[in-house]
Every structure is written in C-alpha cells, then in structure tokens.
UniProtKB/Swiss-Prot annotation:
Residues 460-562, 1027-1179 form a coiled coil. Phosphorylation at Thr-751 is stimulated by cAMP and regulates stability, complex formation and mitochondrial movement. Widely expressed. In the organ of Corti, it is expressed at the outer and inner hair cell layers. Expression at the inner hair cell layer is restricted to inner pillar cells. Detected in cochlear spiral ganglion neurons. The keyword Acetylation applies. The modification N6-acetyllysine is found at K1040, K1086. The gene is Diaph1. This is Protein diaphanous homolog 1. Its main location: membrane.
Length: 1255
C-alpha cells in the first residue's frame, strides 16, 4: 500500500496537464495555502487508495457526517476558482461522460461547493476504513508469481472487484501489463485443460473472463484489449458449452466487440478467431454455438449464442457475406434448432429470434433485387454460360453442372410442353437459390420443400389463356372470313344496283321511245284520217261523175247500138273501176320499226287486194351448202329426207292466213312454169362438190392435232359414204431420227470410233472428251490405235468390276471357270427408238414414283379424277411428257409395244389421249384455281379494309392534326410555315428531327404528348389493323394475277369448245371442265369487281389524303403507314423505358442518400453507445453495449435496401453507381459524390474478374 501523500506528484501532474494548468500555478503552501494543499492531497490520495466498495455506497452516510467534518468549514474559505478546479477533478474521478457532466457544470457555485464537500467527506470515510485496497502493481506482481488453484482464484476475485470499483486511472495503471498477465494465465489454463482438468481451472478461467469484462468496461480497456494479438482468440476459446456460465460471458463479450463502431469489420476479426480455433480443435467454427443452442442447455446460454450469431451477421455490409454466414449455420443444423428455440417462452430469446428473422427476410429481398440487376446487366446467353462454366470448372460442382445440362437435353421437344418445363425448372431453381431467410437450403435433408402449387396454378391459368388466345385467333380468322364475305356481298350488291340502274335507264329510254312513236303514230293516224276523208270526198265526186258518165253512155249507146256491136272486139276494155276486186292499190308505206328491232304490222289492205309471192330463186329448189374451208375435216351435207325432192316452203306464221296468188289479169293466161332442163327431172341437179368434199381424201392432220373423227352414219335410205380409195391418202412423214444421213468426213484421217454395247450398264468415267474438231494434226490423239488392245476378256473384267448393277453377273461365273455352269437369263436392255436417253431416263424416274399402270394413269387423266391427280403430279407430267411429234411417232409403234422401253411404252399409251398437253394444262389450272383465288382474295380484302380503316379512324386523324400543329409551329418564319397539310410520307421522317440534347426525336415528343394529353390517340394502331397486310400487297402483281387468271379461263373455255367428240366413254374432260369454266368465270368476275372496288377506294383515299394514286403505289403507301405505326409504338415503349430509367435513377439517388443517412445514423447510434475516438475515459461502456445487445437496440434500425454499398459484393451497387454518374453528369450544378461510392465495380466487371480468376 502506498502512503497517502506519495501519489501527489503523478496524480496531480496528470490532472493539471489535462486542464492546462501547471503545478506551479496552484496556491502556495503557506497560510491558507497549506489548507488548500491538504485538500488537494486528499483528492490525489483518493485516486491512489480506494476502498473495495463502490463510491456511491458512502453517499448514504455523507449527510450524517457532513456537520462533523472540519473540511467543510475549510472549503468555505477557498475561492470560487479553486472550487471549480476541485469540481472538475471530482467529475473526472467519478468516471462521468461528457453528456452527464454538462448538467452538473451548469449548477450554481453554492451547489458545486456542497457537492465537492460531500465528495470529500465520502472519500475521507473510505480512507478511514481498516482495510484499504491493493495497488494495481501489486496485482500484476501477484499474477506473475505463478499462483494456482485457490490462491489464483482469490486473487482474481479481488482483482475483479478492484477493476469494477476503482476509477479509470486505476485501470490505466493496471494497463496493458496487467492485461497481458491475465491473458497469459488464461492461455495456460486453456492449454492445460486439454491435458488435465483441475477443479479450479474452469473457475479460474471464468473469473479471468469476468476480469476481462471489468477491464473492458471503459474505452481504455477496450482499446488495450483490441491491441493484443491473442485476446479475441482466447475469448473464443473460452466458449465451452461444458462451462455454460463462462461461455455466456465470453459470448457476450464477443458480441459487444462485433458491434463496435471503430475499428471497422470487428465481426470479421471475431470470425477469423473462431476459424483459427476451429482449425486448432478440428471442428466446424460454429459448432460451439450450435452446441450451446441445443436442448439441455440453459436459456441464458441459448440467448447468448443466438445474440453472438446476430452480432456476427448484422454488421456485415456485403449481402454475400451475410448469406454465406447464415447458410453455414443452417447447414450445421441451425434450422432444426430454431424450431425448438421458437417454443421457448422468454423475452430475451424472442428479441434475438425477431432480429434473426428480420435480417434474413431483408437479405432475401436484397437477393431478389440482385437477380433483377443480373437480368438487366447480363442478358447474353454465351457470356452468362461462360461465366458459370468458368466458376464451376475444375471444381466438385463441375460434374453436377454438366448433369444439369444433360437433364435439360431430356426436356421434351414439344412446342407447347417445353416452355412449361422451363418455367417449372426456373421456379425450382429460384426457390433453391433465393431461399427464404437469406440462407442456403438444408443440403443434409433429403426432403426439400419447394412450393410449386402456385406455379402449377399459374400454368393452368396460362393454359387457359393460351386456349383463349387460340380461340381468339380462330375468331380472328372467322372475322376475316366474314369480312371477306361482306366485301363480296358489297360488290355483288353494287353490281346488282348498277344493273338495276342500267335497266331502269333502258326501260326509261324505251318508254320515251314508245311515247315518241305513239305521238308519231297518232299524227300519222290523223293525217291518214284526213287523207281518207279527202279520198272519200273524191270517191263520192268520182262516183257521181261515173254515174253521170254511165247515164251519158247509156244515152249514147241507145243511139249507136249497131255500130257498137260490130266493133266491140276492137274496143279496149275499160279500166277497172275503183272498188273492183281486181284493182291493185299500192300498200301504204311501212311504219317505223319499234324499239328492239320489231317491225309493227302494216295496216290492212283494202278488200280484194293481194300481194304476189316473190319469184323463186334462179335454179332452184335447193340451196347448195357453203363450200368447206381448206384443211378442215370433210363433213358431208345431210341427205334429203325420204321422198322429198326439194325444200318445202316454210309454213305460214301462226294466226296468219295464206295469201293466194293473184289471179291473172282479165284476158291473160297464167304464166307457165319454166320448162325443165334437158334430161332433167324437174329438179335442178345439185352443184358439183366443193373442194374438201367426200370424194377427195382429207389432208393429213396437223402435227400434234387429233385424228379425224369418224363420219356420221347415213340417214335411213341413203347410201353410205364410201371410204377413200387406196393410195389417195397422204402418207405420214417418216419418224424423226430414222433417216440415215451420210457420215461426215473426219479430219486428219481419223475414223469413227467403234460403238460398244455392253450387256449391262457400267459405271461411267466423268471425263471431258475431245471431239475431232478439238484435235490438231500433230497431236497425240490423232495417232492412237486403241483397238489393238481390244479383247473379250478385258470387257468381261470391266463388266465384272464396274457393273452398275449389284447382282453377280454371269461374266463373273464365266471367269471363274466351270464348264457345267447354267446359263442365266438376263433382262435385255431395250433400245430406245424415238426418245433420247435423257428424256427416257427422266420419264422412267417420274413413272417409278407413282407405281401405277400406264393405262390407269391414262384413265385418271381422262376422268379428271382429282382424288388421284395432284398439282405436283400434273406439273411433273407436263415437264417430262415427250413432245407431240414424238408421241405421234410412238403411236405408230403400237404393234411393237412389247419391244419398246418402258418410257416409250408409256408414250404409246398416252399418245392415244386426244389433245394431251392442252388437257393437262387445263387440269393443272383447275387444280391451282382455288389456291389462286385464296391468294388473290385476301390481298384485295386487306387493301380494301385498310382504305376503309384509314378513312374511319378518328384517332389517326387527330394525330395528323397534332403533327400539323406542331410542324407549323416549328416552321414558323420559314417557307414551310402556314401549311394546310403535308404528305403522309412525312410521318416516317418525324424521327429525323432531334431535340436539342439529342435524347429524343419529334416522334418521341408526339408520342409523349399523346400519352399525357391525348391518351385516346394511342389507340390508332389498333384501328389500323389491316395496314400491315396491305403493305405486303403489290397492286401490279395483283393485276397480273387477275389478267393471268382471265387468260387461263379463256384458254380452257376455248379448249373445251374446240375439243373433239369423246371416243372413250371414260373421257369426262369436257363434262367436268365445262362446269369448272362456269364456276371459274363467276369467281373471276367476283374478284374483278372486288379489285375494281379496291382501286376505287384507293383512288378516293388518294383524293382524301392528297396524293397521286398512279405515282404512289398501294404497296409504298401502306408500307409508309406500317413503318410509321411501328415507329410510333416503338417510340411509346422507348418513352416508357426512359421514364422508368429516370425513375430508377431518382429512386437510386434517393436510396443512396437514404442509405448514407442511415449509415450516419447507425454510426451515431453506435457512437452513442461508445465513441472510441472521443477524448476522456468513459466507463460503463461494456455494460451499455451488452444492454443494447440484450434489448435488440444494437440491431434494430431502419435499414433501407442494401444496394448502396461500399463493397463490391452487392450487385445493385453497380447499377446505382452508373445511374448516379449519369445523373450527376446531367445535373445543372455540381453534386458531391461520397468517396466511399467511388470505384465500385459493376456486376459485369465482377463477373469478368471471376472469369479471369477461374481461367
């Protein structure tokens, strides 16, 4: 024990230095100064000698002894400045922090005098106790003296009390030297415990831990402890579940160290110590914690272990680090232990469990956020695969990764099922990797709980959606069909309306004509009536005159009766009187013809008049037939009916009376008929036969044309037409190629090469041969004589070695020798007589693909059997069919059918089909007609619908108006200002006008304008549904297709009309093609009308939007609209993406600011617990840390997303850093970026670095 005055110098000097005063400045020792000195000595001795009890314990008795203390009276005599000095020394000795000292300093000077007086009285009472505490150096000496067992335990208990009760200055005196002694003893006890375990060893270890706790209950002690090399490791080694109380204290101390604000990463130092201890003991580093959490241990130990786990995980800033630690604990069995801990009813346990769960959930959401960042930054398949491959390469995970890929190859290659497989696999992988509570799954457990019910429900819903989409597609097709039918009906209705209007016009014209004729007839009638009246008057006058003449004649006749009788024969007869039956009155002029060419009946003739019949034609009773055209088939005139010598006159018209011939004039005789010709029978002989009649043999048919049809049978009773006499017919030309031309003379004395005919076809060398014209007189090939090497054995070897057939030839058997071999019948290679080898080969290949008898192929063509005939079959048949001349030549070889090659046999059979090639072309057109209609009709409907949609779309019109408004505003003051409209093609050029910052175009501006102010305009792409289809329609090709269809229909119709009469009952060509032509013509007329309507609408659209339809084709116009439609939709998406990016940048900036603010708050909260950098020696630090750990205040903080991170472990940091960099570049003013956020690598850089490390 030191004397009371011995510590004046050091203690006083220390405090004087802290307050900026030297010892010389203190009052002198004489007079009152002696009393003052005694007071200061008491303060100093108090710091050296302390009782074992706490200073506060003496405060209870201070009031009772205060009046008896002579020091109080002496304290009243010193100045206020000296009181303040003593007061500051008292505050320092009381181990109060600055926050608690400030209210005391604000007290009045009187209160401060009382406080100092009470404190001095308390210190005096402690000094008067019989037992005074030992000094720090004495403890150090005792610890170094090698105490063991009970003596060591007693010393450690006394040391613990001293460390708890003495001020910080005492702890500082104990300092690093005393701490080293404690750690040496603790290490020795740990090492000895592994060999032998004494009764006091565990108690001594626990007591040392308690001493360390007391030593670290201030900043000096914590700093000193952290400066040691093995201090944390020894605390970790003290976590022994066999000594629960010691493990509890050790775990609490380690937990407090983990949450210290300075130095950083204290949790990592504790983890390193735990790892080193695990390597020493050859166990898992978290195994002691798991052992302490298991059942059978105390609740306090479980709380302490879980508290240390939270302290290890929570301070870490890196997401990967937290997930890694948590997953390692789960793999050791923490998952099962947690279920037991949740059943414990303890408040401290609930606090720690709550902290663990909250931190795990937050990490889970952070991990999901990292997945979003990966999706944004790493979207290249090859790059992602390469990174994963380099990650697992040459590791234990490599075969498992390969197995995963191999299993993926087994996914069923089904269009519908494959996406469902991958969705299920993705969900499983997501739940495995992004496991709840931010941990890895329990790999020891065979049963892994994966929630796929929700995914299956989604798949079921997706299947329903897909079915609905399929149904919608089907309905869309039906809608297109209905639209097509509607357009067809519209065209038909328009045609009917036009026809009706035309008929109305025709009827109105006829009515007008009839009215005009009626008026003319009425006028004529009036004229005739007037004329009749006039003539009646004249007749009456003439009748009167006649009567007068008769009377006069009668009177004269009475006078000259005799002379009149004698000369009556010479007097000419009087002219017939009016009204006599023999009077012939010329008929009135015929009336004008009625509309339609109908001649109205003439007015009736007066009674007794007659019209003589027209004279017969000269020569004749019969009209000779017209002469036959040259080259046409001779068709004899029909024979006369039996018993009829001449053509009878036509019968009278119905209702008409026969007009008798006029009677002969009085006194005239009938005109006799003309006498017959000499030797005639009264009927003129028929004219001589014209050229081409029966007697002259017909000319041979044209090449490729059909033969002459047989003559019709004779009428009954008429003689048959004799066949042409022999020799009168024109012989057919000789077959092609059968002429034997003279052999050309070869140059240089060359002779024609011998033509070989091997028994079987050999493999042919593919050389480039020289002909005689390629050679020169001095070249090698003009002198060769290869014939000298010719022999049968050589040819047999060639046949054996290079035969194109696979079967063993007879030549091989002949070569092997053997006189008793049997002759093998070989199929002769039939020579081609008409066709060339290439044509015959192609035809044989074609016929081999059908495997049908030739006659059946012929019958199918004759019957036009569409069930067998296909488009490709007819096309190949037309392509491979021999020419008509060749078919004609083959038809003449019918007698040699069996000796012909197969291809020529087919030609013989097909040559009997009349007009084969036109027939095949017509059949091909019939098979293709429906496809042509289905190709043309949708194109017409698309253009028609697109024209109608453009005219009816109000939203598109609004967009054009907005564009016109914006354009006129932007062109203000230029030559383009004040426009009334613009060309539609300008819409595609909107994106060429860019903004001042080059970040958007005029098109983007219009799209954003529509989004914000006119959202209904955004619907115009849906209203122009047929513009895309119309953009693929070429009006020129459409017109050509219609013209081609019209021409083909006309050709087929002409072929049907000119087709000869069928000679085979199976020939249904004319019958089927006639009905087809009729239907095809109707379909064509409908298409033509639809096309005409389309052109009309497009022309009207040109007038509507002011463009020339002749210069701007349908395809170009709708292609511009289609491109603009796509560009507008793309601009809308880009605007949305740009807004999302700006929003992300804004949120990222806010998140960064918030995270930085929370980091500072966290730092402040930690510093509130303990400020390691502040001046002064604050006590009770460890108690505050342990209290914060126990209540959860050290963990609970408002923590935003961990995207803002100083480390590179969090993927989102890269996105925020890049976005903030862009945002800062765009900001008008400078923005200070914290240095901690600089240099943060992006996730792509991390991946590339990982690839580099792996490779």
């Amino acid at each position: 024990m030191e004397p009371s005055g011995g510590g004046l110098g050091p203690g006083r000097g220390t405090r004087d230095k802290k307050k900026g005063r030297s010892p010389d400045e203190l009052p002198a020792t004489g007079g009152d100064g002696g009393k003052h000195k005694k007071f200061l000595e008491r303060f100093t001795s108090m710091r050296i000698k302390k009782e074992k009890e706490k200073p506060n314990s003496a405060h209870r008795n201070s009031s009772a002894s205060y009046g008896d203390d002579p020091t109080a009276q002496s304290l009243q005599d010193i100045s206020d400045e000296q009181v303040l000095v003593l007061f500051e020394q008292m505050l320092v000795d009381m181990n109060l922090n600055e926050e608690k000292q400030q209210p005391l300093r604000e007290k009045d000077i009187v209160i401060k005098r009382e406080m100092v007086s009470q404190y001095l009285h308390t210190s005096k009472a402690g000094m008067n106790q019989k037992e005074s505490s030992r000094s720090a150096m004495m403890y150090i000496q005792e610890l170094r003296s090698g105490l063991r067992d009970m003596h060591l335990l007693s010393c450690l208990e006394s040391l613990r009390v001293s460390l708890n009760n003495n001020p910080v200055s005492w702890v500082q005196t104990f300092g690093a030297e005393g701490l080293a002694s404690l750690l040496d003893i603790l290490k020795r006890l740990h090492d000895e415990k592994e060999e032998t375990s004494g009764n006091y060893d565990s108690r001594n270890q626990h007591e040392i831990i308690r001493c360390l706790k007391a030593f670290m209950n201030n900043k000096f002690g914590i700093k000193t402890m952290l400066e040691t090399e093995e201090g944390i490791l020894l605390l970790v080694r003290a976590m022994d579940p066999a000594v629960p109380n010691m493990m509890i204290d050790a775990a609490k101390l380690l937990s407090a160290l983990c949450i210290l604000p300075q130095p950083e990463d204290m949790n990592e130092r504790v983890l390193e110590a735990m790892t080193e201890r695990a390597e020493m003991d050859e166990v898992e580093r978290f195994q002691p914690l798991l052992d302490g959490l298991k059942s059978g241990t105390s609740i306090a130990l479980k709380v302490g272990c879980l508290q240390l786990i939270n302290a290890l995980i929570t301070p870490a800033e890196e997401l990967d680090f937290r997930v890694h630690i948590r997953s390692e604990l789960m793999r050791l069995g923490l998952h099962q232990v947690l279920q037991e801990l949740r059943e414990i009813e303890n408040e401290d346990m609930k606090v720690q469990l709550c902290v663990f769960d909250e931190q795990g959930d937050e990490d889970f959401f952070d991990l999901k956020g990292r997945l979003d960042d990966i999706r944004m930054e790493m979207d290249d398949f090859g790059e992602v695969f390469q990174i994963i491959l380099n990650t697992v390469k040459d590791s234990k995970a490599e075969p498992h990764f390969l197995s995963i890929l191999q299993h993926l190859l087994l996914v069923r290659n089904d269009y519908e099922a494959r996406p469902q497989y991958y969705k299920l696999i993705e969900e499983c992988v997501s739940q495995i990797v992004l496991h709840k509570n931010g941990t890895d799954p329990d790999f020891k457990c065979r049963h892994l709980q994966i929630d796929i019910e929700r995914l299956v429900d989604q798949m079921i819903d997706k299947t329903k959606v897909e079915k609905s989409e399929a149904k919608a597609t089907e309905l869309e097709k039906k809608l297109d069909s209905e639209l097509t039918a509607r357009h067809e009906l519209q065209v038909e209705m328009k045609k009917m309306e036009n026809d009706f209007e035309q008929k109305l016009q025709d009827l109105q014209g006829e009515k007008d004509a009839l009215d005009s004729e009626k008026q003319q007839i009425t006028a004529q009638k009036q004229d005739l009536e007037a004329e009749v009246s006039k003539l009646t008057g004249e007749v009456a006058k003439l009748s009167k005159e006649l009567e007068d003449a008769k009377n006069e004649m009668a009177s004269l006749s009475a006078v000259v009766v005799a002379p009149s009788v004698s000369s009556s024969a010479a007097v000419p007869p009087a002219p017939p009187l009016p009204g006599d039956s023999g009077t012939v009155i010329p008929p009135p002029p015929p009336p004008p013809p009625l509309p339609g060419g109908v001649v109205p009946p003439s007015p009736p003739l007066p009674p007794g008049t007659c019209i003589p019949p027209p004279p017969p034609l000269p020569g004749g009773a019969c009209i000779p037939p017209p002469p036959q055209l040259p080259g046409s088939a001779a068709i004899p005139p029909p024979p006369p009916l039996p018993g009829v010598a001449s053509i009878p006159p036509p019968p009278p018209l119905p209702g008409a009376t026969a007009i008798p011939p006029p009677p002969p004039l009085p006194g005239a005789t009938a005109i006799p008929p003309p006498p017959p010709l000499p030797g005639g029978t009264g009927i003129p002989p028929p004219p001589p036969p014209l050229p081409g009649s029966v007697g002259v043999p017909p000319p041979p048919p044209l090449p490729g044309g059909p033969g002459l049809p047989p003559p019709p049978p004779p009428f009954p009773g008429a003689p048959g037409i004799p066949p042409p006499p022999p020799g009168m017919g024109v012989p057919p030309p000789p077959p092609f190629g059968f002429g034997v031309p003279a052999a050309p003379v070869l140059p240089f004395g060359l002779t024609p090469k011998k033509v070989y005919k091997p028994e079987v076809q050999l493999r042919r060398p593919n050389w480039s041969k020289f002909v005689a014209e390629d050679l020169s007189q001095d070249c090698f090939w003009t002198k060769v004589k290869e014939d000298r090497f010719e022999n049968n054995e050589l040819f047999a070897k060639l046949t054996l070695a290079f035969s194109a057939q696979t079967k063993t030839s007879k030549a091989k058997k002949d070569q092997e020798g053997g006189e008793e071999k049997k002759s093998v019948q070989k199929k002769k290679v039939k020579e081609l007589k008409v066709l060339d080898s290439k044509t015959a080969q192609n035809l044989s290949i074609f016929l081999g693909s059908f495997r049908m008898p030739y006659q059946e192929i012929k019958n199918v063509i004759l019957e036009v059997n569409e069930a067998v005939l296909t488009e490709s079959m007819i096309q190949n048949l037309i392509k491979q069919m021999p020419e008509p001349e060749q078919l004609k030549m083959l038809s003449e070889l019918k007698e040699e059918y069996d000796d012909l090659a197969e291809s020529e046999q087919f030609g013989v059979v097909m040559g009997t089909v009349p007009r084969l090639r036109p027939r095949l072309n017509a059949i091909l057109f019939k098979l293709q007609f429906s496809e042509q209609v289905e190709n043309i009709k949708p194109e017409i409907v698309s253009v028609t619908a697109a024209c109608e949609e453009l005219r009816k779309s109000e939203n598109f019109s609004s967009l054009l108006e907005l564009t016109l408004l914006v354009g006129n505003y932007m062109n203000a003051g230029s030559r383009n200002a004040g426009a009334f409209g613009f060309n539609i093609s300008f819409l595609c050029k909107l994106r060429d006008t860019k903004s001042a910052d080059q970040k958007m175009t005029l098109l983007h501006f219009l799209a954003e304008l529509c989004e914000n102010d006119h959202p209904e305009v955004l619907k115009f792409p849906d209203e122009l549904a047929h513009v895309e289809k119309a953009s693929r329609v070429s009006a020129e090709n459409l017109q050509k297709s219609l013209d081609q269809m019209k021409k083909q229909i006309a050709d087929v119709e002409r072929d049907v009309q000119n087709f000869p009469a069928a000679t085979d009952e199976k020939d249904k060509f004319v019958e089927k093609m006639t009905s087809f032509v009729k239907d095809a013509q109707e379909q064509y007329n409908k298409l033509r009308m639809m096309h005409s309507n389309m052109e009309t609408l497009y022309k009207e659209l040109g007038d509507y939007f002011v463009f020339d339809p002749k210069k701007l084709s349908v395809e170009e116009f709708f292609m511009d609209l289609h491109n603009f439609r796509n560009m507008f939709l793309q601009a809308v998406k880009e605007n949305q993406k740009r807004r999302e990016t700006e929003e992300k940048m804004r949120r990222a900036k806010l998140a960064k600011e918030k995270a930085e603010k929370e980091r500072l708050e966290k730092q402040q909260k930690r510093e509130q617990l303990i400020d390691m950098n502040a001046e002064g020696d604050e006590t009770g630090v460890m108690d505050s840390l342990l209290e914060a750990l126990q209540s959860g205040a050290a963990f609970r903080r408002k923590r935003g997303p961990r995207q803002v991170n100083r480390k590179a472990g969090c993927a989102v940091t890269s996105l925020l850093a890049s976005e903030l960099t862009k945002d800062d570049a765009m900001a008008p003013g400078p923005v200070k970026v914290p240095k901690k956020s600089e240099g943060v690598p992006t996730i792509l850089e991390e991946a590339k670095e990982l690839v580099g490390r792996a490779s």
